Amino acid sequence: MEVEEGRARVKVEGVFYNPRMRFCRDLDMLVFATMDSKEYFDALSASGIRGIRAALEAGKKAVFNDVSPKAVKVIEENLRENGVSGEVINGDAAAVMRQRAFEHIDIDPFGSPAPFMDSACFSAKRYLSVTATDTAALCGSATNSGLKKYGAFAVKTDVYHEVGLRMLIGFVVREATKYEKALFPLISWVREHYYRVHFKIKKSTAMSAKVYEKMGYLAYCSTCLRKKVLGMGEGAERCECGGKFSLIGPIWLGELKQRDFAEKVAEKAEGKLRAFLEKILAEIDAPTAYSLPALAKIHSLTLPPTDVVVEELKKLGYEASRTHYCGFCVKTDADRDVVVKILRSRKII
């Protein structure tokens, strides 16, 4: 079986290939083309589709790896068919990354990236790209799995994808600090069943300590959906409504993108990719977000248009935006009581 994707045509019979991730790979090519790196290491290559596309569409010198001898044969055949030259390694990804350094490493596993992160952070020199499809462990649906894999506690909130993405970023950033590396998200997103983050790496003892200023906790009340941002070492009392706070974290509280980089990526995009990137660019970086249907349900209110709530928050002097992952969610630095007050005041069409 052969598939065409981007400028590549590859055989996928007998190896893992997920057609649902084509949108992600399309977007990745724009990201890779914006990065100023030359080398790209596809640690878990399978068919080799992403690495081959990186070579053809982003001009990268791709290095491929897979633990399966069958996958290695498929990759080699696909390289020949596409006229691409590249080193192909048959090895355990974590072991390979311990043996040599790579300019840009991509960890795109089936499931959790956690088993590969220590080695990836040790090896990556300038860029690190990470995918997670075990969203239940990250967003609070599987609390124990989140603790074991990512070393952070989460409960499922009304905006669980916001929590999940920040929990993933926080985990990767913490792993890298062990090697005096500071990681910052260039661009990140949530879509369907996965989270995707592209990091810039800075090798610096001082900066690797400073990233913890962007790390902390989210105090969440399941009774009224209130959220409070807490820095490392801070605590939370009972919620104003009388409910008990759950302390989610540690998670990343900083920016989910670097605007100048994301804008350059968007300039290369068309159609659905451009529309998706514009949503990401329009989104503010506040770690607090609210599901308007969930708030409206608690207070038995009719739901206003999301854009109306965003504009009302801005009129009051708060930062506010829609989210790229939920059509009825609002990100804002305003307290939840302010959002509820707006919901109460609107006469809905």
UniProtKB/Swiss-Prot annotation:
GO biological process: tRNA N2-guanine methylation
Catalysed reaction, written as an equation: guanosine(26) in tRNA + 2 S-adenosyl-L-methionine = N(2)-dimethylguanosine(26) in tRNA + 2 S-adenosyl-L-homocysteine + 2 H(+)
Domain Trm1 methyltransferase: 1-343
Positions with a binding annotation for S-adenosyl-L-methionine: 25, 50, 66, 92-93
EC class: transferase
Gene Ontology MF annotations: tRNA (guanine(26)-N2)-dimethyltransferase activity; tRNA binding
InterPro entries: SAM-dependent_MTases_sf, Trm1, TRM1_arc_bac, tRNA_met_Trm1_C
Domain of life: Archaea
Pfam families per the UniProt record, alphabetical: TRM
Keywords from the UniProt entry: Methyltransferase, RNA-binding, S-adenosyl-L-methionine, Transferase, tRNA processing, tRNA-binding
Enzyme Commission code(s) on record: 2.1.1.216
NCBIfam families hit by this protein: TRM1
Function field: Dimethylates a single guanine residue at position 26 of a number of tRNAs using S-adenosyl-L-methionine as donor of the methyl groups.
Family per record: Belongs to the class I-like SAM-binding methyltransferase superfamily. Trm1 family.
Protein name as annotated: tRNA (guanine(26)-N(2))-dimethyltransferase
Organism of this sequence: Archaeoglobus fulgidus (strain ATCC 49558 / DSM 4304 / JCM 9628 / NBRC 100126 / VC-16)
